[in-house]
Amino acid sequence: SSDAQLLSKVMERVGMDNCGTLVDFGNFCLRRENDERWGAPCVEEYDRYQGIEELMAYAHGVSAKSYAFDAEGNETTMDFPRILNIVRGAGFSGFIGVEFEGPDADPFPGMEATKALIETVLIN
């Protein structure tokens, strides 16, 4: 599901309203170091912004995955406002799940920061 173009073609062929995608902001790694499946660094990535744009046409859900924040509450590994504007521009009105996969042992501050950033961008 990391190759949005391929997944979009699958969705077109399925062509059923009850079949959709879960657009995950952090799921665009095409190949990892040593061809590992998980855990190894990503060495080839599908363009995140293009992928989100392509998959939003089929979105039944969105997973706002984050990894790191600066002192001002901005996600530092990707352009969250740009992504959320893609989601909004697609007319999505469903649920946005919150995920945090940062290095901290306690994920709750990261999830709270993610939620706050979503609210800041989408409400303002």
Walk through the language-model features, giving the residues of each:
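Residue-level detector of solvent-exposed, low-hydrophobicity positions
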Residues: 32-37, 74, 87, 99-102, ...
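C-terminal helical cap(s) of enzyme catalytic domains, especially alpha/beta-barrels
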Residues: 107-124
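Acidic/histidine-rich catalytic cores of soluble enzymes
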Residues: 1-85
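Short helix-capping segments at alpha-helix termini
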Residues: 13-18, 89-92, 122-124
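Active-site clefts of carbohydrate-active enzymes
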Residues: 59-73, 92-107
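Short basic/hydrophobic patches in alpha-helices and adjacent helix-turn junctions
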Residues: 61, 82-90, 102, 120
